[in-house]
């Protein structure tokens, strides 16, 4: 029986199902894996028995992924499962930042006791005249799960859509509308845009990527939208641009001491993925990833280990080795197997950055001494006997 510890409220209705062969436990010390959402695990003392962590959501900033990699713990996330929810909210922000909807509604509430409100509302509406999205130029930074959907939706709205993503995958390139005009540099994307929306992860090369230089390239009174990660935007630069009128509006999903005091903003409570459908989709994907890893050793959508799959574990034995990406690891592994006269049916090795993953099937179960010898290889983080 495999044991799962859940952290956070995974779904709105509380239903989380792994199926036969799994049970939920009350403490992480009892668990084989953790299913979580947004709790910050930095500083968390992870029990040695934890083999994997799956986050129900994109990203992994709340998890010390490299630290866990060195402990042989695979961290999964669920990219794309909440992408439609984020896309819809971004589209809503495009409308709200262009039509004075909230300001108009506030006027109505503030004047609810006015006996002549019908007449006065007609007079007041000219203060909330906005602009249409059709024909306006929008730049989309990042054409992944969310960005590609936003770009395609903006095409459907009749906008002039430009996209920037030097690392776009083949999968997302195929689904991107031919009407989206891809550009080669961030500067070319920003130049003359009426709207700019950001959809990239937080990494060393994306932190602060939207600052004064990029804002100055936008069209006058442009709108900036950030429903990606808080750190992508230089808050001081955005604050100054709003106060100077270079930006007419800023919408983001991250309430910080700085953003909440900026003028002309819509700040939401990290609600981009806040739908029941998105929560369920994320949970389903995370559960599927955990089960495939625990049962078969396969890795998909990990943020600290490479993707790797050998299908279902059908041989007599399957072993997975999590180790540093250094020379001669395969040689050392196969030498130990040869010493035990183990016949390897299939073997695969993948690497990502500093970490690597080796998995193999054998005709017979390996001796405990062979498993122990594998564990003693320098730079070996963990050896799993899957079957």
Enumerate the predicted regions with their spans.
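Phosphate-binding beta-alpha-beta segment of Rossmann-like dinucleotide-binding domains, i.e.
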Residues: 79-137, 298-303
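Oxidoreductase and adenylate-handling cofactor-binding alpha/beta cores
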Residues: 87-106, 155-159, 284-298, 334-338, ...
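Rossmann-like adenosine-cofactor binding region
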Residues: 42-44, 167-259, 274
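A conserved regulatory-domain signal marking ACT and ACT-like small-molecule sensing domains
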Residues: 304-387
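An N-terminal-biased, well-structured beta-alpha scaffold segment characteristic
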Residues: 1-79, 211-213, 217, 234, ...
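Hydrophobic/small residue at the entry helix of a nucleotide-binding pocket
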Residues: 146
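Rossmann-like dinucleotide-binding domain for NAD(H)/NADP(H)
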Residues: 216, 220-313, 322-324, 357, ...
